[in-house]
A protein has these predicted regions:
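ATP-binding N-terminal substructure of ATP-dependent carboxylate-amine bond-forming enzymes
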Residues: 1-105, 373-376, 380-386
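Peripheral (often C-terminal) accessory segments that flank ATP-dependent C-N-forming ligase machineries
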Residues: 4, 303-388
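Short acidic-hydrophobic, aromatic-tinged amphipathic segments that line or gate anion-handling sites
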Residues: 50-57, 131-135, 164-167
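A conserved helix-loop-beta module that forms one wall/lid of the active-site cleft
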Residues: 94-162
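Conserved ATP-binding module of the ATP-grasp superfamily
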Residues: 126-128, 149-152, 161-198, 224-229, ...
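ATP-dependent carboxylate/phosphate-activation module, predominantly the ATP-grasp catalytic core
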Residues: 170, 190-256, 260, 280-308, ...
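A short glycine-rich, hydrophobically flanked beta-strand micro-motif that places a catalytic Asp/Glu
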Residues: 257-269
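Conserved protein kinase catalytic/activation segment
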Residues: 272-274
Length: 388
């Protein structure tokens, strides 16, 4: 099988997806803007050939690269990046070269929050009320219906960049004076007071969930980004039944097959009800794939590659641990030094590292990943690391 991996060098964990595709027999080809000499040895081993482009945003260059590989190796069976930023480019290439997977006729349903809502409604899962902005008067009518506060965010994209909580009409006008918002399509959502619970995993060619997981975010990512705060989250050993039921209903509504998925729900504080927020048909970002590996003693990189290549039946796994992530920000003064953290809880820490600058606003400048057998213990470690 000819698989073309776009941007295999970034983010860093793309190497692992590539490695196991190669291990399971794929003829793996890569396109990226990094010099071949800068690729790590594990990635070089995984790639049969690498085509460097000077600008990954230049579609003509990508078109020529895919054409080159098609002429040399025959039909490309898969084109993947597993990266939210490149999903539209993936769909365009699949459309132009008739490659299996999500194409132009469906991609906006996975990218635009305004289009996701109809699928959430089809699933029967309650969703956040939203309005796609057209003009001030109509927006204020929507706000009158749902009440302040509301959340303004880009219609397309992930993360919390250019996302704002608005508490009154004065703030509304201030936010909409932002040139970026004037030039972009965005939506206004009702504010839901709750924590985020995710439904993550793998769904096979037949629509069967073969691996499932859940992360718990007790902070507002919007507040973390806007206030330049430090983030923490917890990968749970078990998926709550209400999250599982909602997640599988959403997967069925979107008719998801042979993909990673990462679906975000609110658990509303006032009544514990699950409310759908958004869907991402890709692995969860940052260190979350590794968190799933640690929580379940498994290897999701390997299991994804195995699923794509249908190499052998999937290996089942059971969650055992709470895996925590606690970030630090350079501008904050913490009570405990890095050395004190390693001395005190080093036996629980699985990995620690600085974060790439492009992710640091949300994910922190430096972070620790660790696991324990109880929720109480993982929270104590988070508090210790982030104590100021």
């Amino acid at each position: 099988m000819n698989i073309l991996f776009f941007s295999p060098h970034f983010p860093q964990n793309s190497t692992e997806f590539c490695f196991y595709l190669k291990e399971y027999g794929a003829n793996l080809l890569g396109i990226g803007d990094a010099e071949y000499s800068s690729l790590n040895d594990r990635l070089k081993h995984s790639l049969s050939e690498y085509y460097r482009v000077s600008n990954m945003e230049d579609y003509d260059q990508i078109l020529r690269a895919v054409g080159f590989f098609t002429h040399k190796y025959g039909k490309i069976d898969r084109f993947e990046s597993l990266n939210e930023y490149w999903l539209e480019l993936e769909a365009q290439i699949r459309t132009d070269f008739n490659i299996s997977g999500t194409k132009n006729d469906f991609i906006q349903n996975l990218k635009r929050k305004s289009k996701m809502k109809s699928f959430f409604e089809k699933s029967g899962v309650q969703t956040v009320k939203c309005y796609k902005y057209t003009d001030r008067e109509s927006a204020l009518k929507f706000i009158e219906e749902v009440g302040y506060p509301v959340v303004v965010k880009p219609d397309s994209g992930s993360g919390a960049n250019f996302t704002y909580k608005i508490k009154n009409e004065f703030e509304f006008d201030n936010v909409f004076a932002n040139k970026h918002l004037q030039d972009a399509e965005f939506i206004i959502e009702e504010f839901v007071d709750g924590i985020i619970l995710t439904y993550d995993g793998l769904v096979d060619l037949y629509g069967n969930v073969i691996f499932e997981n859940s992360h718990r975010f007790e902070q507002s990512i919007m507040n973390v980004v806007n206030n330049d705060d430090h983030l923490y989250y917890i990968c749970l050993p078990e998926v709550a039944e209400k999250v599982r039921l909602a997640g599988r209903s959403v997967l069925k509504a979107f008719d998801v097959r042979e993909k990673f998925f990462h679906i975000e729900f609110f658990e509303r504080k006032r009544d514990g009800k699950i409310v759908a927020l958004e869907v991402n048909m890709r692995p969860p970002g940052a260190w979350m794939p590794d968190a799933m590996n640690y929580a379940h003693d498994t290897n999701v990189y390997k299991r994804w590659a195995n699923m794509v290549l249908q190499y052998q039946p999937d290996e089942a796994s059971t969650g055992r641990y709470f895996t925590g992530y606690a970030a630090r920000k350079n501008h904050k003064k913490y009570k405990y030094s890095h050395e004190e953290i390693l001395n005190e809880i080093g036996d629980k820490i699985l990995y620690c590292s600085s974060i790439e600058k492009v992710f640091s606003r949300a994910m922190g400048d430096f972070a620790y990943q660790f696991r324990t057998e109880t929720y109480e213990e993982v929270k104590k470690i988070i508090d210790y690391i982030q104590k100021e």
